[in-house]
A protein has these predicted regions:
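Short, Lys/Arg-enriched N-terminal segments with co-localized hydrophobic residues
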Residues: 1-5
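A glycine-rich helix N-cap at a beta->alpha junction
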Residues: 78-94
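N-terminal catalytic cores of NTP/NDP-binding nucleotidyl/phosphoryl-transfer enzymes
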Residues: 15-78
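Residue-level signal for inorganic ion chemistry
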Residues: 33, 86, 125, 185, ...
Length: 267
């Protein structure tokens, strides 16, 4: 599903698969938008200069989804999509850390000394200046700078990427999608907004209106888009298909679920 050159490391316990020593960034990377892409380009240049691999550390689930699931924003990308975009950006390794209560209890000092220094051997670290980490969110950018001076690694702030006075961020992309401004969303992302998933058998109501229907349950509590859209569908044949998509909720025994229904035209 992603470039063979990029290696996915699932969990800290599998870090022996990665070489010791890296340039590193940490974040959610939701959407892998143009701001993320600019950061990754900068990291690749740093990695080439130092002769070190580029490592991106992400968390699954995202921290807010563990601590306040009802307040967590809609995801722009599933994990599989995120990995694909990161691979296209030239990342060497993605470390996907299982974010659970146990990991969240790790002290800020242990996060630095055990994970960043002992396990990863970080030489260059780029994070947002508002980055918080460790139990109780005790760790911050200043603590990382002090640790860098102590352990011998460089720490830099990820620069805000703006265009036309608009800060390019996952939040800005979500707002554009909420406003049904797909052109602006694509401009911020650097690629069209897509939703992917596995087609499942539905109730075959589509047959009664004369169009085949593809049903994709969305494994997320909330979708960044809802309503009816003209879409292009890939992965069901040799060429893209034209369709009309309806994104909304569907009643289930357990409550409701997010679902994407696509009526395929000219099939």
């Amino acid at each position: 599903c992603f470039e063979p050159d990029m290696k996915l490391i699932r969990g800290i316990h599998n870090l022996s698969q990665a070489p010791h020593g890296c340039v590193l960034t940490i974040g959610n990377f939701d959407g892998v938008h143009r701001g993320h892409q600019a950061l990754l380009q900068r990291l690749r240049a740093e990695g080439r200069q130092r002769g070190l691999p580029v490592v991106v550390m992400i968390f699954e689930p995202q921290p807010l989804e563990l601590f306040a699931a009802d307040k967590a924003p809609a995801r722009l990308t599933r994990l599989r999509e995120k990995l694909s975009y990161l691979a296209e950006s030239g990342v060497d390794y993605v470390l996907c850390v299982r974010f659970d209560r146990r990991f969240a209890a790790l002290t800020a000092q242990d996060f630095i000394s055990e994970l960043l220094v002992r396990r990863l051997g970080v030489q260059f670290l780029a994070v947002g200046d508002d980055f918080r980490f460790g139990a109780g969110r005790q760790g911050d950018f200043l603590l990382l700078q002090k640790a860098g001076a102590e352990y011998g690694f460089d720490v830099t702030s990820t620069q805000t990427f703006c265009e036309g006075g608009v800060r390019i961020s996952s939040t800005a992309v979500r707002q554009a999608l909420a406003d049904d401004d797909l052109v602006q969303a694509e401009n911020l992302l650097g690629h069209p907004f897509t939703i992917s998933g596995r087609v499942v058998h539905g109730d075959e109501l589509g047959r009664t209106i004369g169009f085949p229907t593809a049903n994709l349950p969305l494994r997320r509590q909330v979708s960044p888009v809802k309503g009816v859209y003209a879409v292009e569908v890939t992965g069901l044949g040799d060429k893209p298909l034209v369709g009309v998509a309806n994104i909304g909720t569907r009643p289930t025994v357990a409550g409701v679920r997010q679902q994407l229904e696509v009526h395929l035209l000219d099939v």
